[in-house]
Amino acid sequence: LPEQPKSNLLSNSLNRTQFIQAISFLPLTGLTMKLEGLKKMTDSLESTGKMPVLFLGHGSPMNAIEENEFVQGFRKTAQTFEKPAAVLCISAHWETRGTQVTAMDFPRTIHDFGGFPKELFEVQYPAPGSPDLAHETKNLVQKAEIGLDEKWGLDHGAWSVIRHMYPDADVPVIQMSLDYTKPPVWHYELAKELVKLREKGVLIIGSGNMVHNLRRVAWNKLNAEEFGYDWAIEASAKMKEFILDRNHKPLIDYSSQGKTFQLAIPTPEHYLPLLYSLALSENNEEILLFNDKAVAGSLTMTSVKIG
């Protein structure tokens, strides 16, 4: 039997507070058609030029439908570069044994949370998928045997941010899963194999949160505009220093960086997407931080644009 995804799905009985706490070979005719389609895709990719790389702090699922400074940051950042030919998103909310990429034509919108307003569950983000990009990604990666997934779709780590960037859902989106059996350095090295996609107009997005400790959320500060515990602010400051200095080794070896990092990253899934984004950076590229705030004590929304 195929390995089932180890996702971050939450019971529908959870309320919002609990969520935060818990939170090929073809016939000749077919081949001709395929080549024509690939030519169109290649033409489109060539026209966009090299894409930047993003890490987006996605925060609460409510950011999908709320108008706040964080979604404004996503929107404004998307306006600073050309519309991509496609998006490849590495989301904190899709963990599997082995690495998968979504390969369907039309990925479903996954509402992988519970206890939120009906309005949030009614959101659909009907962006097309890209089987061609999924196959190209599979062929690029030599570090692992990439599986082609036909069941997952777009989880809220992807659609809750991308819908603000491309509200018309007119950019193809695929997701890549996080192999929960592998160490951080493995993820970093795998990400480096994706660099050629940037040259083909693919926007690669890591979606998570640098500091993400739901067990230590400050309940009395949930509605504060900005609040971070001292340890969260200290860990965030060190992370940002390493990022801006292009010093990735301590970020990869985060478990050896002391108590503040241990509190900031109690589990790896929201942090690992950052390593994917950093691995794709080049020495001469500009690095910009935005949405740089701590919320609810133990979460940061800090996001990164590279290139």
Residue ranges and their predicted role:
Residues 1-14:
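N-terminal secretory signal peptides
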Residues 15-33:
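N-terminal export leaders
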Residues 37-145:
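A short aromatic-anchored loop/beta-hairpin motif
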Residues 52-56, 86-91, 176, 197-210, ...:
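Beta-strand elements within well-structured catalytic alpha/beta cores of enzymes
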Residues 54-55, 112-119, 166-175, 252:
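Short, basic/glycine-rich phosphate-binding loops at helix/coil junctions
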Residues 133-188, 193:
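Internal, conserved structured core segments that host functional sites
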